[in-house]
Amino acid sequence: MTAPGFVDFPDSPFHLYQPYPPAGDQPAAIEGLAQGMRDGLMYQTLLGVTGSGKTYTMANIIARLGRPALVLAPNKTLAAQLYAEMREFFPKNAVEYFVSYYDYYQPEAYVPTRDLFIEKDSSINEHIEQMRLSATKSLLERRDTVIVGTVSCIYGIGNPGDYHAMVLILRAGDRISRREVLARLVAMQYTRNDADFARGTFRVRGETLDIFPAESPELALRLTLFDDEIESLELFDPLTGRVRQKVPRFTVYPGSHYVTPRDTVLRAIETIKEELRDRLKLLTAEGKLVEAQRLEQRTRFDLEMLQELGFCKGIENYSRHLSGAAPGEPPPTLIDYLPADALMFIDESHVTMGQLGGMYRGDRARKETLVQYGFRLPSALDNRPLRLEEFEARMRQCVFVSATPAAYEQEHSDNVVEQVVRPTGLVDPQVEVRPARTQVDDLLGEIKLRVAAQERVLVTTLTKRMAEDLTDFLAEHGVRVRYLHSDIDTVERVEIIRDLRLGTFDVLVGINLLREGLDIPEVSLVAILDADKEGFLRSERSLIQTIGRAARNLNGHAILYADAITASMRRAMDETERRRTKQLAFNAEHGITARGVNKAVRELIDGIVAPARHDTLESAIAPEVLADEKSVAREIRRLEKLMTDHARNLEFEQAAAARDALNALKQRVLLDGAA
């Protein structure tokens, strides 16, 4: 086996880190899909089984073709997993993350039956907002960019032309007045704050301007002026103030995707007034006087805000006026920032394509009510996600990636490439059917065998009630078990899966949450209860996906508890057996001995997963922190800043954790002093 190292390809800006050379079906899949791209094929499908290294195949195709890429995943958890893997394969290139930046989002809505208007309410995750801004910056600046995203990318963001026009380019030696720089920064939605220097703010001290770029995770820019000339540009650490490097040139990107030049705002105000006049005439003619008064009051307030500040709350509802688009035209989205020759990969496409098709209809139904009852102008209907046909019109050359392609991929694909043989030699799990009458007792016996071998178990049920009852039953019998359900937020889900891998507990019970892409090599048994209840949770695709969760383990085994074999079960078992036969034949022909996957448990996204818990907070204090008084004082200041930052972002659990760590450190210092 070749040693791990970086691989470069001709005319490609990517430096691919290869921990191992492609193996199994990977070389043929990489060559087949890359050749299809070169031949101009629009749609291709990678039919890759669980654990066959589909992400590695995607990375190899991107590196060989040397074109920017967008990789879409069906949810934030899988996007985070893909992002972490892509960063490992391309550590020297721009790998970016573009998902919804809302931790919590309540869209504005009106319920006519109760005359209830619900105001828009949301909580934005600052870390993800910074990553979104970084993603568009990379697309505009460099070719070696891989964006990992979710369906969030079909929702409207600012027009690429306006966004690019607002960029501020600073060069050492250029002539520009301090007043002009400040005016440009305010127009780019940066705020002046001399006390609290955070992302998207700037501060002024005499002839020195400090700017904290909105897309920068850790470095800020210091601009020193001499009269009206830029004397120097320096990147520095905002916490310590230490200068990291001098730069001859720096580009400051807008503080938001929704920035708009002043003349565009003034033009939009006139067209909004025009639309308001027409709409008020119509509502009055129909005798809807309450709706007319409501619409006029709300819109006039927004117009005043736009006139004075250049933006208003809910500015996205006027996006059609701001972009100058015609009624019914699709909004600008992340797809518009992609170069024409970009590549697209749609991971778990059997789920993601359905999502892309469904987003528009739900959004439209809610907004039509708001327009009908005078809460919004009709142009608000054009602030929407793309329809499926609009997304298709904007698609670049695309590879659908799935172990179970749906009808859409089968109809559209010009080329289907199978990736069934795994590089590790692992084969699909053995599938066994057992009677459902005694499923719970039988499962308990199987769990005890797996726990004794230090292996993990996934159990999938049909209903929430059954999942809860089963969790209680297993816990009463001494099994370390957790229950994963839809009420658990993204971050906690990632933590639960990590704890399962680390052995904090042994059995995870869920309903529809243990399927696509979950990468848990420690799981050796997947138990599917009531497998004969035909429906979307027990369809052929669902069963194949769930069985696949045990395919990363050497002793992988799947048990279907059923009293009859349904058509879906039969097809799923036949497909698993077909793949298993092909894998065993390949191993025998090449003399391969299957080996288990030893994958390090890592954090998916820096700063998103909470730190590891300790039995006592005192035990969590690193010895070097207590080395001397300076170190202790530095750590206390760090924790205090962390606590206030979290509290400001309404991240109260993290703020409480920082407070507890701070109290524990102070307690430890007091005890040591007393001793």
UniProtKB/Swiss-Prot annotation:
Motif residue range(s): Beta-hairpin: 101-124
Primary localization class, coarse: cytoplasm
Subcellular location field: Cytoplasm
Residues that bind ATP: G48, V49, T50, G51, S52, G53, K54, T55
Residue span, Helicase ATP-binding domain: 35-192
SUPFAM superfamilies in the record: C-terminal UvrC-binding domain of UvrB, P-loop containing nucleoside triphosphate hydrolases
Superkingdom: Bacteria
Keyword flag Manganese: no
Domain UVR, residue spans: 633-668
Function: The UvrABC repair system catalyzes the recognition and processing of DNA lesions. A damage recognition complex composed of 2 UvrA and 2 UvrB subunits scans DNA for abnormalities. Upon binding of the UvrA(2)B(2) complex to a putative damaged site, the DNA wraps around one UvrB monomer. DNA wrap is dependent on ATP binding by UvrB and probably causes local melting of the DNA helix, facilitating insertion of UvrB beta-hairpin between the DNA strands. Then UvrB probes one DNA strand for the presence of a lesion.
HAMAP family linked to this entry: UvrB
Stated family: Belongs to the UvrB family.
Protein name: UvrABC system protein B
Species for this entry: Bordetella petrii (strain ATCC BAA-461 / DSM 12804 / CCUG 43448)
